[in-house]
Amino acid sequence: MSRGKKLFLMTVLLALSLGVSLSFSQQDTALVCPKVRELLLTELSGEIAREHVIHISRFDRIQASAGWHEAALYIMEQLKRYGISDARIEGWPSNGEIKYYTWTTPVGWEAEFGELWVVEPQRMRLASYEELPTTLVKHSVSHDVTAELVDVGSGLRPDDYEGVDVKGKIVLATGYTGDVHRQAVIKRGALGVITYMAPDSRRYYPDLVQYTALWPRWSERDKVGFGFNISREQSSMLQRWLGQGKKVLLHAQVKGKIYESKIEMMSATIPGTTFPEQEVLICGHLDHYKPGANDNASGSAGMLEIARALQRLISRGQLSPPKRTIRFLWVSEMYGTIAYLKNHPEVSQRTIANINLDMIGEDSVKTNSYFYVTRTPDSNPSFLNDLVENMVIHTSRVNITSPRGSRFPFNYRISPYGGGSDHYMFTEGSIGVPATMFGHPDPYHHTIQDTVDKVDSTELKRVCYIAACCAWWMANASDEEALSLAHEVAKRGLGRAGLDLCRAMRAMDDSTATPDELYTAYKEGVNVVKHAFYREFSALRSVLLFVEKEPTRGYIRLLEENLGANQRFFLREVEDYYGLLCQRLGCPVRKITLTEEEKRAAKLIVVRSEEFKGPLASGYLAEKLGDETIEEKLPLRGNIAYETINFIDGKRSLLQIRNAVSGEYRPVELKAVEEYLRMLEKAGLVRIEERR
């Protein structure tokens, strides 16, 4: 029997066994069934979600604070009212010294008052905590001082302070307040810090007042000063006076304290009936400054509304209880999440996927924004990407609005992996939970201008609808649903691999290349294609999580074989193109071989230490290695550094890790990868062993 006939017969038999219609009439391409979509679309309310945003944004709810706890109690009260009775708050010690893996916990903080006044050359108020809460930098402690102002530029580097006496003075800087505070106050005896957004940051918004914190260690508590945030417009006035040679005298009054606290999380569930030990996780960080409306009262409120809608539909009998548990997790961003993962190691095994809701309610016109979804990184390929993308596309074709919301079309992007929120904790290599983020870029993010008037009930409803549909699908999927998803993953995966093939071709397509440069580009191109298919094979296999019947498994194996055939075709295409370009250059075709450096790297296996789980915290290497400039010396940064660590599994060689991150992003020097991993080894985070 020919392969084509075999595949067709397998398709027919499987479709009949699962009761799938083979009609080729116009089809609904959404993976979530119409009945569930209709019920959720009717029940979910952007108006109710926005009302919760209003309530949550009234709390000044930074991590490890009483305000966070009060906001959590508000959510717990609503959950109980909706019939979800198992909500609970957990907490773990947090004091600026205790670590969970590489992450140092924040101190607790509370404040009663904070004002900053100009005394000379003219009296005027610059900042008031009561009026605008973000003007007082979090973790500021009680002071009542009058002191001279000194401009220290960024205030981040030692050379910013050369020839400048800051002791007993207040410094003005553009750097992050916590870092400036450590340099100016803790190390050099300044009294306090005033910071503003640098000129190249959100340049069209000169009146923004940012949210920042000092992040002191508990051992530094006797040296902690204070900080105020002002607008760029206000800073220009101060700099103008200083530039004119005028003495600028300020009066700062703060009533605040830091203390040993707890970092808290709150969870609630809709229990599963068939596979209760398997969990679909919806999370979002509850913390932030007051108001923090879109960031992230919107995500916290959206979770609450999804929980309400699902529980209401179940209690009415319109939906049956889910087969798998749906867990809602209101987190303290990053610091609480890592503490939760440390104290709940079962998360890695129980959680099949995570949807992180962070800034989901933007009015797209007022914020000049759009909705985006981040894909999982290549170190953690998953069906989740295609399930979510399918629902996002479906939502863009449905006229979803809210009574008091906007009527604008749904503007969205599907983005490559990016961090910056709690999904980055879950999808990290040692945790291994596929995770995506739903969010919006927003110029008002982390500023006092992140207010409720910029929250759109229509956008809230749309995003809640996508999240609820995807969560419900995962909580109930079995063979029939898995088959549809497998098709989606395989076909979209082939398209993604095709784009990577184009990237490989373009890398070779340089008319000025030498034969050696062309060979290197060819070698990298082959790596790109192989990596692309590794990613897509892994994503397709992840669908097997929902499969119980052998015919479905067999069909998915056939889809894998088809992917394999396409991989061979793509690699042949790269090889043929390389041959053509060699012919043009008049040089011989070279076979791919390993250099001596690559042969050595292929024998080196990288192993994580048992205590190194979760992402590497910023500042940990500086603290561990005793070099505060270490971050500037790192040969790898950002997503490439993150993925380099994620690909460490105790089996991959140094060369394989280098090839993986190069296939995902761009060619990375093997020397840079080894240098970075050697730094981690020196810090006790990994071991590099020779393969025996």
PLM feature spans:
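Bacterial N-terminal signal peptides
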Residues: 10-19
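Noncatalytic luminal/extracellular "stalk/propeptide" segments of secretory-pathway proteins
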Residues: 26-35, 42, 46, 54-167
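Soluble metallo-hydrolase cores and metallopeptidase-like ectodomains found primarily
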Residues: 32, 109, 131-160, 214-294, ...
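Short helix-loop-beta-strand segments that form the rim/entrance of peptidase-like active sites
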Residues: 51, 309-339, 347, 357
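Extracellular/luminal Protease-associated
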Residues: 54, 66, 127-226, 295, ...
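Metal-dependent peptidase/peptidase-like ectodomains
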Residues: 126-127, 227-228, 235-236, 275, ...
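His/Asp/Glu-rich mid-to-C-terminal helical/loop segments that flank catalytic regions of hydrolases
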Residues: 324, 443-499, 560-561, 568, ...
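Short capping segments at the starts of secondary-structure elements
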Residues: 645-656
